[in-house]
Regions:
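Helix-to-loop junction immediately C-terminal to a conserved catalytic motif
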Residues: 54, 355
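Conserved ABC transporter NBD signature motif
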Residues: 62-77, 363-371, 380
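ABC ATPase NBD coupling module
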Residues: 74-87, 372-385
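Conserved ABC ATPase "signature" region
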Residues: 118-136, 405, 416-434
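Conserved ABC ATPase signature
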Residues: 140-144, 148, 438-442
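Catalytic Walker B motif of ABC-type/P-loop ATPase nucleotide-binding domains
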Residues: 165-168, 463-466
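Conserved beta-strand-loop-alpha-helix hinge in the C-terminal portion
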Residues: 222-248, 518-545
């Protein structure tokens, strides 16, 4: 019988600065060549468990350990020793780069081992080809897209022929199409190298796009389930801990189709439905289509637009490339609109132009009918709240309370009102128990929620959020989005830049689709998410509802997608 490559026995860990353990009584065996998904909500202990595997715990982040952990049959002795077994790809790939070029970054570990240059070049090229990164070895890592950066990071750890590849939230910063390619790449690496793959991620459905042996579900530092995908996707434990079930599972459940392990529901392409069950889905979609036939997709155009972008163009001086070309659209009070498209499509550049971080080269941006060209950044900030994609680029105070209070204090708000506002917004963002914590103690996803709180606490008329749910588990995702919905119902215009097609489908009535600096489409969200041609052009990915419609022989997949978009299927 094969011995475990990784084995936790009655393992618990407590950070020295914390009162209670972060991990409790972990008993887990992982065998050579397995592909494992570790899933759980924010704060469940996923990242801490990963840090135990790569040696950051206890050698960098010290604490109290009980029980045992062996890797390769040995007790970890140092980070250096573990690096021979475990290669880690961080969630924030920028924090991992050390070389001036991508090739130099991949070669870093070999340089430290004084590897002969000819051998080094050959090995760098081989591993770059393995991950599909051989076309940009001379490029600076900082100039690459999110997906390209991830490939360079993978190559940098695979070059040491490690037995274990550990990936911390590999999908967090990727557009849907690139995320799909990342999962395919990880699957390809597993097949070609035979290494053990451990993925830490809460986006269950996206990871299960390709084969996974087991899913380890964590909550409050404990393993609550260790199951195969066919069992985990229908487990009530997902609802209990706050992890989203796959969209097609939720749809089938609401329609009244009984999904069991025997139907092989772990992946949509393995799902086995009877003819009667497929007919049930078709009849439901038809009924939902009839019920919504009189509904209008028009948004309110009876008032002056709150924000109007007119023929806007922008070129980055250092590259002389057109980041945006002839962009025009209107936003009306109370709209909730998504901006979608590939990495590098111009979505974030547009947001920077609206808030004044960059100046338009052509065209104009109007707020309530008035050109904002002469407004300063602080003046624009009084009208439009902005939440960046990377929280580390926004946070400037060491303590959470002071960080969220900063915008209020510079505006002269009284301390009692500051306390009241902060308590309310931290509660909504799921951060109330961290009120007096230092920022440094938070996870990446928790920092993201702090920056959303920074914007929400000022009660702006427009909120622009760049990837508002990146790094969030389903429970916090839902809390944040429902809070945005409540603001939206009060007339606050919400503009969301997102890669999350579930978010677009569930919360956006309208979607602006960008590709290569152009606005390809301005349509209802359900139309965008049921148009494979448009999805391919913009590096999007149709939701699993589209594929479910195809499996059930629904002629017009939009009927099922629209039903979900309009609330016919519960989230």
């Amino acid at each position: 019988m094969t011995s475990p490559l990784i084995e936790f026995v009655d393992f618990s860990f407590k950070y020295r600065a914390q009162k209670n353990p972060t991990l409790y009584d972990i008993n887990l065996s992982i065998y050579p060549g397995e592909k494992i998904l570790i899933a759980g909500p924010s704060g469940s202990g996923k990242s801490t468990l990963g840090s135990c595997l790569n040696g950051l715990i206890p050698f960098n982040n010290q604490g109290d350990i009980t029980g045992s952990l062996t890797i390769g049959g040995k007790k970890p002795e140092s980070v250096f020793q573990l690096s021979e077994f475990v290669g880690s790809v961080l969630q924030d790939t920028d924090a991992q780069f050390v070389g001036l070029s991508s090739g130099e970054d991949i070669a870093f570990a070999l340089e430290n081992k004084v590897c002969p240059q000819a051998e080094m070049k050959a090995r760098v090229l081989d591993v770059a080809k393995l991950v599909g990164a051989d076309g940009y070895l001379r490029h600076s890592p900082q100039r690459l897209s999110g997906g390209q950066k991830q490939r360079i990071s993978m190559a940098g750890v695979l070059i040491e022929n490690t037995s274990i590849l550990l990936l911390d939230e590999p999908l967090a910063a990727l557009d849907p199409s690139t995320g799909k390619l990342a999962i395919e790449l990880i699957d390809d690496i597993a097949k070609k190298t035979g290494c053990t793959i451990i993925i830490i991620e809460h986006r269950l459905e996206d990871v299960l796009w390709r084969h996974i042996d087991r899913v380890i579900l964590l909550s409050s530092g404990r393993i609550v389930e260790d199951s195969a995908p066919d069992k985990i996707v229908i487990s009530e434990n997902l609802d209990a801990v706050g992890i989203r079930k796959p969209l097609y599972i939720s749809a089938l459940s609401r329609i009244g189709v009984d999904v069991t392990v025997a139907k092989k529901p772990g992946r949509l392409d393995s799902l086995q439905l009877t003819d009667n069950e497929k007919e049930k889905v078709r009849l439901w979609a038809k009924a939902a289509s009839v019920n919504s036939a009189l509904a209008s997709d028009k948004y309110n155009e009876s008032t002056t637009p709150l924000l109007e972008v007119k023929d806007v163009g922008f070129t980055y001086a250092e590259t002389e490339t057109d980041a945006l070309r002839d962009i025009s659209f209107k936003l009306y009070p109370g709209e909730m609109t998504a901006i979608v498209g590939a990495n590098g499509a111009g979505k974030s550049t547009l947001a920077k132009l609206i808030v004044g971080f960059e100046e338009t080269k052509t065209g104009s941006i109007l707020y309530n009918g008035e050109d904002m060209k002469e407004l300063t950044i602080p003046e624009r900030a009084e009208r439009i709240g902005y939440v960046m994609q990377n929280p580390n680029q926004m946070i400037c105070k060491p303590m959470i309370f002071d960080e969220v209070a900063l915008g209020l204090r510079v505006r002269g708000i009284s301390e009692p009102e500051i306390n009241e506002r902060i308590e309310r917004v931290l509660s909504v963002c799921g951060l109330q128990r961290f009120l007096k914590w230092p920022i440094s103690a938070l996870s990446y996803g928790q920092k993201k929620r702090v920056t959303i709180a920074d914007a929400l606490v000022l009660d702006p008329k427009i909120i622009i959020l760049d990837e508002p749910t990146a790094g969030q588990d389903w429970r916090h995702y839902t809390d944040i989005m429902e809070f945005l919905v409540s603001l939206n119902k009060l007339g606050v215009t919400v503009l969301m830049i997102t890669h999350d097609m579930h978010l677009c489908l569930e919360y956006a009535r309208r979607a602006l689709v960008f590709s290569d600096g152009r606005l390809l489409a301005d349509k209802p969200a359900y139309e965008v998410l049921s148009d494979p041609v448009l999805a391919a052009k913009a590096n999007l990915r149709e939701t699993s509802l589209y594929d479910l419609a195809r499996i059930c022989a629904i002629d017009d997949a939009r009927t099922l997608v629209r039903a979900y978009n309009e609330g016919g299927i519960g989230g």
